[in-house]
Amino acid sequence: VLIVVQLGVRAALAFRGYFYWDDLILIGKAGTHNLLSPSYLFDDHDGHVMPGAFLVAGAIIRAAPLDWTWPAVTLVVLQLLASLALLRALHVILGWRPVLLVPLTFALFSPLAVPGFAWWAAALNSLPMLAALSWVCADAVLLARTGDRRYALTGALAYLGGLLFFEKAAVVPFVAFAVTALLEYVSGDRDLGAALRETWRAGRRLWVASLALTAAWIALYLGVVNQRRWSSDLVMTGELLARSFTHGIVPGLAGGPWHWDRWAPASPWATPPPAVMALGWLVLAAVVAVSVARKQRIGPVWLTAVGYAVACQVPIYLMRSSKQTALELAQTLRYLPDLVVVLTLLAAVALSAPNRPAGRRWLDASARRTAVTAGLAVLFVASSLYSTSTFLASWRDDPARPYLHNALSALAAAKAASDVPLLDQEVDPLVLQRVAAPENLASHLFALVRDRPEFAPATTQLRMFDPSGRLVAARVTWVRTIVAGPMPRCGYFAQPDHPARLALDGPLLPADWTVELNYLANSDGSMLLSLTQGPAVKVPVHPGLNRVFARLPGAGDAITVRANTTALALCLASGPVGFIAPA
């Protein structure tokens, strides 16, 4: 029943969401690459190696371009798999006991896992990893108990599946080893060293296979990912880590943060009120006190929990941190879904520990204890649902949704009106910024849309997307001007064996520029345009007096024009070079 309720909440979150940032990058890549090519599957996606996520995303995007329905369905299905795998792991550790509901409730409703679920690109990484994490932990415990080799095989396969979606899944065998060893330690009378040795011996087949997979994946990762992205800013990493505890993890123990802020195009970040932060610390203190008073041998369990809370975040902060990094990065909470699962599994291990023989009687099983536990669980769920609802309100404040809806309608109308191509251009920076180039180009984002004009590097009718996604008439701004040519009544003259150098009235810095070129041609054909420093762009020409707009990447103080067709002669006049703006 709890899983069904969770799926209802997550379905509402999924279907009321929309594409955001990396989702649009995935759309652009799926529209411009072969889905089975190594360059697509093993692309360095901002430090991630995720062929499984690329393949799933690409297949869905190809089947229904820019349709949010199927990404939302995948979110719910993947969440179901992750939740069922966690339930299996809790059952393996605790059995079908009512106490199982305590850690399960925390895992299913904790707001700490919500941001990583709502963002499709992030969920394609984390949810398969969470399913693999729970499954491998359960298999490791069962292998240690029964010695059945099939658990070594299924555990290794599940681990490989997690790696295919997220390189962070490399933590899975280490978490599984820790959970199995701690369960062995708290359930018996061995010391911790003996429990570790027994865990290695009993699960050796799984551990050796997992280490081999880990080594191979590390080699692949190092070969794919640009290692220069790593930072050595330990001070900023420490500040991010501290902020994740004070504004994320600790308030999350009480169902916080309750409140979120957002400045587009950033994703929401947690801004818990002081009361929620204080409540989180009280909950943490109470859980530590009650667990220590009730259970024996759980010191290593708590140390492991704290250690993982630090270790699971340090690599990502080392990769993301710099002097310009905002501390709000740690408050987005999207790096914490695996921590929720690990804390849940460790809680199950702690609940398996023997009670203290001289423990407090009010902690013994009774109707009163059951009522108090149920009441606290209801309060936690209510607090968590409130945090989830406020997150959703912030998450839905996304400029991509109206922009893409308007753009799709505008593209369809433009296609119906004429066959004139659209000049390729960047989409609005609140939707996708230049740092994502070339996926921020309209030709990439809308590559799979069928009902649209072609995108081209040149056009005779200049139009642009305005900030709302509508197509409007456009002009070229006068950043620089083509100086009038030397030939009377012609300007600049170009033939196949006689290129023309069109001087500008000043230099251009490196950028994607647009030129308005007025020309007179004697026949159909094409010409090649290029800045002093930049690639050549092929532009079609037509006989007579015409005007063409072309997108020219590069820099320099002149434009070179080469006639690209035999017997083609061109006269070229002055015009602006700059950016496109509404007319």
Ranges and model annotations:
Residues 2-43, 47-51, 57, 61-69, ...:
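Intrinsically disordered, polar/acidic, low-complexity terminal segments
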Residues 17, 45, 49, 70-77, ...:
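Membrane-embedded glycan-lipid processing machinery
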Residues 76-79, 85-102, 108, 120, ...:
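Transmembrane alpha-helical segments of multipass membrane enzymes and assembly factors
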Residues 98-117, 124-135, 151-159:
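Membrane-embedded helix bundles of polyisoprenyl
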Residues 142-160, 165:
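Short hydrophobic alpha-helices at membrane interfaces in multi-pass membrane enzymes
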Residues 172-215, 219:
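Perimembrane helix-loop-helix junctions
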Residues 296-324, 377-380:
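Transmembrane alpha-helix segments characteristic
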Residues 323-355:
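Hydrophobic/aromatic-rich transmembrane helices and adjacent perimembrane loops
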